[in-house]
């Protein structure tokens, strides 16, 4: 959520920045609502003061032995008017808040202006795509050759965009997640967390999934005996529970940064993706991801973004997977991000790079929703923290990249050296 004072005092400047990312802010509507809010605020305060004054007069009149009934009736009437004014003010403030919750974050000044993914800017490349002297098989064909990917079984169990992994392919999937967690915890300074896969509405509001992206989530039906408390949704990413661990907290600045990681399944409806990536593991309703989250001082967040992106890059480098790093343009950034780097890994069968990690600085956008603050020992004032999140990495897509980049002419899949300790020294699948 943006700073309400910024929306009130600099609406035109905010509108200009939002226009860079293709969002039209209705400045006139917000201005009219704000003027109405000011009028109601003054009215409420005046009624409150008048009622307090009249209430005090009742006691004074009673002490003088005067008839207090007219004053009592007047106080009651003022109370009714005050209640009505408060209700109108509350409704208006709720309307303003509802609008504010749909406004995306402001892009950082250095983010390239653009409309969509075609306007993203490549920053760097690492590694050289392998040249094959045989016909490249995609991961689906390789998985079926080794009886490791069973999409038909998943359709029987659930439906499309799910998979059953088996044997050494399932083992490699697990090995990848363990490797990523060990790297982030042992070398990059993250603490490992196990988090719920179901979260409540407040948590989803905190990180910005609600109200705007309710349709992207899988929601549970409340239990009858807990109808008011069990309106949960499956997490679309571990960013949601990890970041909300600091919701409502005031953190000592000496304890920052807080760096957390978790390996979880992620659940997404993929609304609007009909017909896209229907073959294989690239776009699933359920997929695993190792997530990185950092909670930092405001002045440290841009440096933290560079660091976090480097942590994701290290996974790809140790796996020997060619990739490119791009900075997303204003029109392609996520709702809460002010700056985002994507890492795209080389997928031989598609002869292109595909997203495997997205690392974002969310500035104070989530912190304001969550009321997550920090305070230094020398200053009693609190300030909002900055939050960052990044994939380190998407496990299923990493599996795709390993299978395709490490395939052999006979269909075997070489196991990258860094994964062999997690697979009992296995050198090849097949």
Curated annotation (Swiss-Prot):
Xref: InterPro entries: aa-tRNA-synt_IIb, aa-tRNA-synth_II, aa-tRNA-synth_II/BPL/LPL, Ser-tRNA-ligase_type_1, Ser-tRNA-synth_1_N, SerRS_1_N_sf, SerRS_core, tRNA-bd_arm
Domain free text: Consists of two distinct domains, a catalytic core and a N-terminal extension that is involved in tRNA binding.
HAMAP family named in the record: Ser_tRNA_synth_type1
Function text: Catalyzes the attachment of serine to tRNA(Ser). Is also able to aminoacylate tRNA(Sec) with serine, to form the misacylated tRNA L-seryl-tRNA(Sec), which will be further converted into selenocysteinyl-tRNA(Sec).
Name of the protein described by the UniProt record: Serine--tRNA ligase
Lineage: Bacteria, Pseudomonadati, Pseudomonadota, Gammaproteobacteria, Enterobacterales
EC number: 6.1.1.11
Binding-site residues for L-serine, renumbered to this chain: 237-239, 291, 391
Subunit: Homodimer. The tRNA molecule binds across the dimer.
PANTHER family per record: SERINE--TRNA LIGASE, SERYL-TRNA SYNTHETASE
GO BP annotation list: selenocysteine biosynthetic process; seryl-tRNA aminoacylation
Catalytic activities: tRNA(Ser) + L-serine + ATP = L-seryl-tRNA(Ser) + AMP + diphosphate + H(+); tRNA(Sec) + L-serine + ATP = L-seryl-tRNA(Sec) + AMP + diphosphate + H(+)
One of the record's GO cellular component terms: cytoplasm
Pathway: Aminoacyl-tRNA biosynthesis; selenocysteinyl-tRNA(Sec) biosynthesis; L-seryl-tRNA(Sec) from L-serine and tRNA(Sec): step 1/1
Binding site for ATP: 268-270, 355-358
Top-level taxon in the UniProt lineage: Bacteria
Family recorded in the similarity comment: Belongs to the class-II aminoacyl-tRNA synthetase family. Type-1 seryl-tRNA synthetase subfamily.
Keywords: Aminoacyl-tRNA synthetase, ATP-binding, Cytoplasm, Ligase, Nucleotide-binding, Protein biosynthesis
Subcellular location field: Cytoplasm
Top-level EC class as recorded in UniProt: ligase
Record-level Gene Ontology MF annotations: ATP binding; serine-tRNA ligase activity
Organism, as annotated: Escherichia fergusonii (strain ATCC 35469 / DSM 13698 / CCUG 18766 / IAM 14443 / JCM 21226 / LMG 7866 / NBRC 102419 / NCTC 12128 / CDC 0568-73)
Pfam families according to UniProt: Seryl_tRNA_N (PF02403), tRNA-synt_2b (PF00587)
């Amino acid at each position: 959520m943006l700073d309400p004072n910024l929306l009130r005092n600099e609406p035109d400047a905010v509108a200009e920045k939002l226009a860079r990312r293709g969002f039209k802010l209705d400045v006139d509507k917000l201005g009219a609502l704000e003027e109405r809010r000011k009028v109601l605020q003054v009215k409420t305060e005046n009624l409150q003061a008048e009622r307090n004054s009249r209430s005090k007069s009742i006691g004074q009149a009673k002490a003088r032995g005067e008839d207090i009934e007219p004053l009592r009736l007047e106080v009651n009437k003022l109370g009714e008017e005050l209640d009505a004014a408060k209700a109108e003010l509350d409704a208006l403030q709720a309307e303003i808040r509802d609008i504010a919750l749909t406004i995306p974050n402001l892009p950082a000044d250095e983010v390239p202006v653009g409309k969509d993914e075609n306007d993203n800017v490549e920053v760097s490349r690492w590694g050289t795509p392998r040249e094959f002297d045989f016909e490249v098989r995609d991961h689906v064909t390789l998985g079926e050759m080794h009886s490791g990917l069973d999409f038909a079984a998943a359709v029987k169990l659930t439906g499309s965009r799910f998979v059953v992994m088996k044997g050494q392919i399932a083992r490699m999937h697990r090995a990848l997640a363990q490797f990523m967690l060990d790297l982030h915890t042992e070398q990059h300074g993250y603490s490992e967390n196990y988090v719920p896969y179901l979260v409540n509405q407040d948590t989803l509001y905190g990180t910005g999934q609600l109200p705007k992206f309710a349709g992207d989530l899988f929601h549970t039906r409340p239990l009858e005996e807990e109808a008011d408390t069990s309106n949960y949704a499956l997490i679309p990413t571990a960013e949601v529970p990890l970041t909300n661990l600091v919701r409502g907290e005031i953190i000592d600045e000496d304890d920052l940064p807080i760096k957390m990681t978790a390996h979880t399944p992620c659940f997404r409806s993929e609304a609007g993706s009909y017909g896209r990536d229907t073959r294989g593991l690239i776009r699933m309703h359920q997929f695993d991801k190792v997530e990185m989250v950092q909670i930092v001082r405001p002045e440290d967040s841009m440096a933290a973004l560079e660091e976090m992106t480097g942590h994701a890059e290290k996974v790809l480098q140790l796996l020997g997977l060619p990739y490119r790093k791009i900075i997303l343009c204003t029109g392609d950034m996520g709702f809460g991000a002010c700056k985002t780097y994507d890492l795209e890994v080389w997928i031989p069968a598609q002869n292109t790079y595909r997203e495997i990690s997205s690392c974002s600085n969310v500035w104070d956008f989530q912190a304001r929703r969550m009321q997550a603050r920090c305070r230094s020992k020398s200053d009693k004032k609190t300030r909002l923290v900055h939050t960052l999140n990044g994939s380190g990495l998407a496990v299923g897509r990493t599996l795709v990249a390993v299978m395709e980049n490490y395939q052999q002419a006979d269909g075997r899949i070489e196991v990258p050296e860094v994964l062999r300790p997690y697979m009992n020294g296995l050198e090849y699948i097949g």
